[in-house]
Amino acid sequence: MKPRVLFVLHLPPPVHGASMVGKYIHDSEKVKEAFDAQFVNLTTASSLEDIGKGGWKKLWSFCEKLREIRKAIKTQRPDWVYVTPNSAGSPFYKDYVVVQLCKRWMKEKGRVMLHFHNKGVQTRQERWLDDKLYRRFFKDVKVILLGKPLYEDVKKYVEEKDVWYCANGIPDNGACPEEKVHEVPRILWLTNIMRTKGLMEYLDALRMLKERGVRFQADFVGGLTKEVTGDEFELALTVHGLNDCTSYVGKKYGPEKEAYFREANIFVLPSYTEAFPLTILEAMQWGVPVVASTVGGISAEVGDGETGFLIGGKVPIMDNMFRPDALELADKIETLLTDKELRVRMGKAGKLKFQQEFTLEAFEKRFVEILSQVSTNS
């Protein structure tokens, strides 16, 4: 008999990393073949802007989700409950309730598995209330993390024997990256226009490159946010003297987004904080070398000096205090801008690493193996 698993996860909309992985799990034939799977959508936000907000409507929706979970546990009697919780802040407090109730409703202890698509425990663990909650939250659970670097985030509360590692994957679109022949190399930023993504440091780095006489075209693809309005972004480009070597095209999806990866020579993500961004996997799929911060699990994606460059040191950074150094960022980008052979070599290495480790097929295989192993050993 197949193990019965209740998957309590986030599904789109809105579209973000965790919800996309949730959709991959929900739609996976391998998961359905291996397990008697039932699903509850934990999402209460209607848009990206709605994430983290409160209100009576969302409270009512949350209560409905709890009723749905309780009913599924009582009627389906799953062997395991799988939950994708948030790790810090007000979203964590909500998911704390979900996880603790799941533990209570399950007849046996140790039958809840937590799959984290984010990080942040280490940033809150010194607070008295959060520390008390984390100690209860992580008791009698199994944990899946996106990569070994992220164990640092939870090691205060979880023994590594109760942790499994499952890197995300994305569908292999069969992209055959061609050598990009541009008179002026193109740098791609593909994420929301936010300060916490390292926007201002990146603009500083681009200004340095321009002052050095290095030629480039920097494309910005992503939505505007409350952090940076359209007027503020336009002003920042003007102040940095970048209007003649940058373009902002807004959000792009599907083939339109792929067109920018196809033409990019370098992909940048100098974020203050990340977990395991799927956009880096997309860049690798298209054979684009990556320059990114050493935050969260990015070092498990990018081989420093092999498939791109990491900035911020060799040790993965878990706190939210990191700020990328604009000079270091400029130097790494310049190295790739001025060395075509290095760009091509790193791009090919990234494509190979993607095919070996980060396809959706590889993710599904790892995911099913982990859940099967946990079910067998428990």
Language-model features and meaning:
Residues 135-175:
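Donor nucleotide-sugar binding/catalytic pocket of nucleotide-sugar-dependent glycosyltransferases
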Residues 289-292, 302:
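Short hydrophobic beta-strand element within catalytic cores of glycosyltransferases
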Residues 328, 335, 342-356:
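A short, well-ordered alpha-helix in the C-terminal region of glycosyltransferases
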Residues 272:
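Aromatic "clamp/platform" in nucleotide-sugar-dependent glycosyltransferases that forms part
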Residues 41-45, 190, 217-232, 250-251:
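Glycosyltransferase donor-sugar binding loop
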Residues 231-252:
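Nucleotide-activated donor-binding/catalytic signature segment of Leloir-type glycosyltransferases, i.e.
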Residues 251-252, 259-264:
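Short alpha-helical donor nucleotide-sugar binding micro-motif in glycosyltransferases
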Residues 6-7, 178-206, 218-224:
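Conserved donor-binding/catalytic core segment of Leloir-type glycosyltransferases
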